[in-house]
Amino acid sequence: MRLRAGVAVDLGTVNTLVCVAGRGLVLEEPSAIALDRDTGRVAAVGRAADALAGKETQDVEVIHPLRDGVIADLDASTAMLQAFLRRARLHRGLLRTSAVVCVPSGATWVER
């Protein structure tokens, strides 16, 4: 069996990396997301969100949604990954794209 992946994603506790076949590493950003406390909308992701950490206003909350290499906040992780894939210009055609997502070897079935 030959594995052909169009996209590889490494959701790390500190950084998230996205690689695309034929393009190489297209995104390396801190695994952080800033959310509007009132609406829940994404205010910033990656470096922009990480820069807000410790400087949050009452309106914005910065979340690092991965802990010990696994997803601790599913909703925030999903929103962050969607934003990263948009930034990497992968928002179109993902239904037909093979993907490899890295997970720690010690992750439980639920964490995977």
Where on the chain are the PLM-derived regions?
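Nucleotide/phosphate-binding catalytic cleft detector across ATP-hydrolyzing
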Residues: 1-112
